[in-house]
Structures are given as C-alpha cells and as structure tokens.
C-alpha cells in the first residue's frame, strides 16, 4: 500500500479505498492491518524494513501528524468510539487531507496547519 508518495495529500483516502477493496473480496481488514500495510508492510514489500517504516532508532522517518476528527460526521463518530481500534478505523475511513495537522520530512517541519 503506497501512501507516502509526496504531494498527493490523499493518504487516508488511499487507506479507505484499500479497505473497501479488501471488504469486497471478503477479507476482514482491521485498522491495525491497514496501518501496518501503510507503514511497516510497505517498507517490507520494498525490502527496506530496516531503513524505513517504523520509529526504531537509526531508521529514516517522514512523519505526518493527523487530527482524529475533522468535520461533523467524523467528530461524532470519534466521540462514540468504544476503543482505540474504533477511533483509528473511523479516522482512516472518514478522514481526508483536512485531517492533516503537520508534516516532517528528514527531520524538518515542512507543514503545520494554522492553529496547530
């Protein structure tokens, strides 16, 4: 699952679309599996898991900070979530580029939404 392509701004849409494809094929894809596919799993598929895809010391990291809920529907869904998995699932399936709060690349902050 490629979600780190610079500049496209549709990370959460990509994850949500992948979830839908999995569901249509009868595969139960949890929020944790989706996060793995977008991070460590993608690095592993490229045979780069020792260099990227995690926060382990010595690895390279581009970091994106997200707001949990932006907009009325997502805010309500976040408020009624029973656990962390439900919060992450709602964020992944209802979120979009408006949820982006800040981005760091190679240790430098490149973007911070006003008010964050």
Predicted regions and their residues:
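His/Asp/Glu-enriched, well-ordered alpha-helical/loop segment
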Residues: 1-75, 93
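C-terminal cap of metal-dependent C-N hydrolases
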Residues: 60-115
